[in-house]
Amino acid sequence: YPIGTGAWKVIQYDTDQQIIVQANEDYYEGAPEIKQVTFVKMDNEAAFSNAKSGQLDIVMVAPNYALEEIDGMHIENLETMDVRNISLPCIPEQVVKNPDGNEVTVGNNVTSDVAVRKALSIGIDRESIINNALNGIGKPATGFTTNLSWGNPLVYEDNQREEAKKLLEDAGWIDSDGDGIREKDGVKCEFDVYSPSSDQQRYLLAVAVAEDAKELGISINAKQGTWDELTAKANTDGIVWGWGQYSPTVLKSLLYSELFLVGDYDNTVGYSNEEVDKLIDEAIDSNNQEDAIKKWKEVQAVSAEDYPYLYIVNIEHSYFVNDSIDISVDTQIAHPHGHGSPIICNMKDWKVNE
């Protein structure tokens, strides 16, 4: 085998169906104990059904399945950096020209008030939201991630209801008509939050956040749509996003002012902060890892004062695992966003239980 060959070799690849890999007996760290693994593409319900019938040994499931029981299998809830946040447009509603010269509507007259964004961030009860939406599976998040070297250094207390209410009142958001929703200058403290119709987990999070926000006098309308519909709404409404990359450059996508209106997913909130832009440039240009990490942490510390995103949860990835298989939890690494397959990162360490 050539230099750089891994612990596995692909012996069969059927597009959109399955991949079969076989242990590399000549792997330099020793051949894996498990000799062959088959990956099968299925939707969640089909995968869960096949696990129950004994046809699958490992299956990833959404939190609504994680409290189920399957004979001969156990649940593993694995640590991630897979964060869910809601984007909160930072500029008032207005019509601007995009890079193609077309006029587009951007901004939101409610979320553009930093008092509203901060009140939500400090006022919601993340533990309650996670319990209601995700069966309690996940860890409260107040920033992008804390389990990487460049991760968010700031963790603050939430569920500060009274402080959040005072913040809103001091900013002029008052419930003057007694309907439970605050107003300011004739504008209701109300906005829409969209989640992809393909991801029920995100919709349940939006619903749980909306229920919690009522306690603050903020009305959030949880809605669903296709990704095309979501990208069309991303500059004017809240979106429940999923993020989780090992590289800190994702922070540029979220926060760099020049990226507004450039792509479908970059800085959809119209965030602009010269100090943050400068820190991002310095972090990317740095040829010293320690200095770059320091800059990325400063990026998060400075931008956190503006609350452009409402961070909710670092979800955990839930897997049913056959009792006969040891997936070596101790050598798992924090999983990235769900598009990856991180559970297999240590597949060479997996063993069959005696």
Please name every model-derived segment.
Residues H74, Y256, H317, H335-H339:
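Histidine (H) residue identity feature
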Residues V321-E354:
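Long beta-strand-rich cores associated with HINT superfamily self-processing modules
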Residues P2, A7-A133, S149-D179, V187-P308, ...:
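Extracytoplasmic/periplasmic ligand-capture domains
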Residues I137-Y156, H317-N322:
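Mature extracytoplasmic/periplasmic domains
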Residues I312:
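Active-site-proximal polar cores
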Residues K139, T249, G270, S341-I344:
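Low-complexity, intrinsically disordered regions enriched in charged/polar residues
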